[in-house]
UniProtKB/Swiss-Prot annotation:
It holds the Pfam family YABBY. Signal peptide: none annotated. Keywords: Developmental protein, DNA-binding, Metal-binding, Nucleus, Zinc, Zinc-finger. A zinc finger (C4-type) spans 15-42. This is Putative axial regulator YABBY 2. Residues 76-115, 162-184 are annotated as: Disordered. Interacts with SPL/NZZ and SPEAR2. One of its GO terms (cellular component) is nucleus. It comes from Arabidopsis thaliana (Mouse-ear cress). GO terms for biological process: abaxial cell fate specification.
Length: 184
């Protein structure tokens, strides 16, 4: 996959939380709009206006010390500024260390583990039951049998019980001709 560099600009952004250098590729059409970037290392969200930053960082001559432009807790350096000398990156990291205290990154909420569905619980228990009765059956065959058992027993879907329940017995008898020993 090739990237057309004539339609976009690659810039380097320092994360204000973990000081990781991020390569940001921005289309020229979006240069003067506010861009949000997420750090892949610490998941910190960085908001910056790359067009304004590029204009301000490219104005001074290359031989002068690099003065990073700060926009919403980020610093931006263009490719030619980073490549000009190792001294400029050292000055940049020193300036970041001297700045105001850092705010903690905005982290997404943790995902809660969901309770397994009735279908998943039934299939798991049914596979275990089938394999206990016939240990030589493959997992694939046991799953297929368990899925058929789920499909052909409507009382399972609705949570009806067979113990003394007249309706449950009627439902069980309606599929009795299709099964042997209660299971496929």
């Amino acid at each position: 996959m090739s990237v057309d560099f004539s339609s976009e600009r690659v810039c380097y952004v320092h994360c204000s939380f973990c000081t990781t250098i991020l390569a940001v590729s921005v289309p020229y059409a979006s240069l003067f709009t506010l861009v949000t970037v997420r750090c892949g290392h610490c998941t910190n969200l960085l908001s910056l206006n790359i067009g304004v930053s590029l204009h301000q960082t490219s104005a001074p001559p290359i031989h002068q010390d690099l003065q990073p432009h700060r926009q919403h807790t980020t610093s931006l350096v263009t490719r030619k500024d980073c490549a000009s000398s190792s001294r400029s990156t050292n000055n940049l990291s020193e300036n970041i260390d001297r700045e105001a205290p850092r705010m903690p990154p905005i982290r997404p909420p943790e995902k809660r583990q969901r309770v397994p569905s009735a279908y998943n619980r039934f299939i798991k228990e049914e596979i275990q039951r089938i394999k206990a009765c016939n240990p030589e059956i493959s997992h694939r065959e046991a799953f297929s049998t368990a899925a058929k058992n789920w499909a052909h027993f409507p009382h399972i879907h609705f949570g009806l019980k067979l113990d003394g329940n007249k309706k449950g017995k009627q439902l069980d008898q309606s599929v009795a001709g299709q099964k042997s020993n209660g299971y496929y």
